[in-house]
Amino acid sequence: METNDRQKSWLKVWGGRLLNMIFFFCMLFVVYLVSGVFIVTSFKIPSDSMEPSLQTGDCILVDKCSKGARLFDVFAALEKKEVKIHRMPGWRKFKRNDVLVFNFPYPGRWDSIAFDVMSYYVKRCIAVPGDTLEIKDCHYRVKGHDGYLGNTAAQDKLQKLLDSEEFVNRGIVVESYPFNKELGWSIAEFGPLYIPAKGSVVEMDSLNRMLYRNLIEWEQKEKLTFKRDTVLLGDSVISRYCFRENYYFVSGDKME
């Protein structure tokens, strides 16, 4: 009888300890999941586009509190379905030169915006909502901002390359968005481009129709079409447009 009592006592003690350990590790796992969704998560740099600041394979910690965590249906996202995203309140706005992790808005094609929320890019913020951005001689410029923007050493290097005899003699011009030969924007001379802020209004002239068509169609889920001098959003005639979201201009640090 005494032996049985000892065995029962031993099982009770170690059974309780085992349950406590299981509970402890379950709580750790829950804390890990919650912190990864709402507070901070790790991200591995997938390419060399941020060199020399960040190297391929580097792991960085992404602060989710500053802008606010995003909540969405993970299972739908894994199936490559379009998901509705709810963003929690944040405590500060993104600033110029911040390093941002985001979803690339053109995963499949260049003429329309879409998002794969399970695929991430990392770039440096050059312009924030409400800024007017230009590129002059390969260097970023924002109206009213006198500080540096991006990796100026890489911009100097790119300018020297494009001004080299080989490029000049061949007449090489590297076009950039919106890839319109009449407009003539390139990676060396670009803009001015207004970066839309939530609530800002633009006139639907020929230039703005070209620059902001993708953004407008993504926000409204309607096609923006042109008939002579008339702009149609779906079946409605519009002469100006009020943006629903804030937008940012980002770039890699490496320019080669």
PLM feature spans:
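Hydrophobic membrane-insertion alpha-helices, especially the h-region
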Residues: 19-38
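N-terminal signal-anchor transmembrane helix
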Residues: 42-53
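Soluble "head" domains of membrane/secretory-pathway proteins
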Residues: 2-16, 51-256
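Cytochrome P450 fold signature focused on the C-terminal beta-domain
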Residues: 41-42, 127
